[in-house]
C-alpha cells in the first residue's frame, strides 16, 4: 500500500463500514465509494462522510463553497422545454425575434427562480444544464453540476436524503436534501468536489491519495479487498483465526472422519484433506519456510490444543497464534470456500466418462 500504514488503512475501512451499516448490520456495498487522486502523500488518504467526485461548476461565476446546503438532485435537462411535435415559426420582424428570445430567456430564468424560491443552494443534474440556465443559476447564487453519472446521482441522493426529481413542478421541502457543505477544491490540477453529508448520511467515500499512480492503484486494490472481507465479517458477525489455522483444523477433522468411512470413499475424504492442506503449505512457501516441516509443526500444535498459523514476521515466517497477531478471516468467507470446494469436488467425482474434443 505504498507509504500509508496498513493499520491506518484498516481503521479507515472499518469506520467506513460502520458508518453506512443499518440497524440490521446490513451494508450496501455501493454506499462505500472509492475516489483516487495523485499529487499528495498516501498519508493524506481520508474518509469523507459523503461523496467525492471530479467535476467543475456549470458556470465559472458560481460559488465554489456552500455551507449548510439545501440540495436538489435532478434527472432532467435544465433548458427551454421542447415540444413533442416539431413546430416551425415564421418571424417577420426584429420585434418578433426579440419577443421570442425574451420568452426563451424568461423560461430559463424561471428555472433558476423556481429552485431559488424552494431554497435550493446546490443542484446536481444527471443531464445537461444549458449555458444560459447556468448563468441564471449563478446569478441566483446556486452552485450547480451538469451531466453527473447515474452512480453519482444515486450517491448524492443517499448522502443528502434528497429525492431524484424529473420535474420542477410543485417542488416541496421533502423533495430536497441537506449537506453540511459542498466545496470545490483544486487537487492535482483538476477540480475535485466534496459533498459532506449530514449526520445521517448513508454514503461515504474513501479518498485515496498517493504520490504516484502505482501507489494509488496498490492502495485502491488493498482497500477493495479489505472492504469485501470487512463487510462479510460485520454482516455475518463471526470471525475465525486466519494464517492457515482453520485449514489445518479442517484437514485434521477430515482425516479423523476418513477412518469411519469404509471402502473407496475414504480415499476421497483423504484426498479432500490433502487439498485443504495446500493452503497452509502455500503460506509456508511464501513465508520462506519448508512446507513439509511447517505442516508437521502446525499439526503438532493443533493436536496439543493450540491455535497456530503461519505468520509473516520480517523477512521470514513463524508459527504462532494468529489471533495474537490480529490475523483473522470472516467465517462466512471460509464457509463459502469449503462449500464451493465440496460442490466442485462432488461434480468431478460424479463424472463417469470423458469426451475428448476432436
Feature map (PLM): residue ranges:
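Short, mixed-charge, low-aromatic patches
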Residues: 89-92, 109-114, 179, 206-208, ...
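Extended amphipathic alpha-helical scaffolds
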Residues: 1-205
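Ordered, soluble secondary-structure elements with a strong preference for glycine-centered loop motifs
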Residues: 3-7, 102-106, 127-128, 146-150, ...
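Non-catalytic terminal/interface segments that mediate subunit docking, oligomerization
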Residues: 62-96, 200-202, 206-213, 217-225, ...
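Structured core elements
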Residues: 33, 72-75, 122-124, 136, ...
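Charge-patterned, long linear interaction tracts outside catalytic cores
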Residues: 17, 21, 29-41, 186-257
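Extended, low-charge hydrophobic alpha-helical regions
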Residues: 215-222, 226, 230-358
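Flexible loop/turn segments at secondary-structure boundaries
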Residues: 80-83, 130-134, 213-216, 248, ...
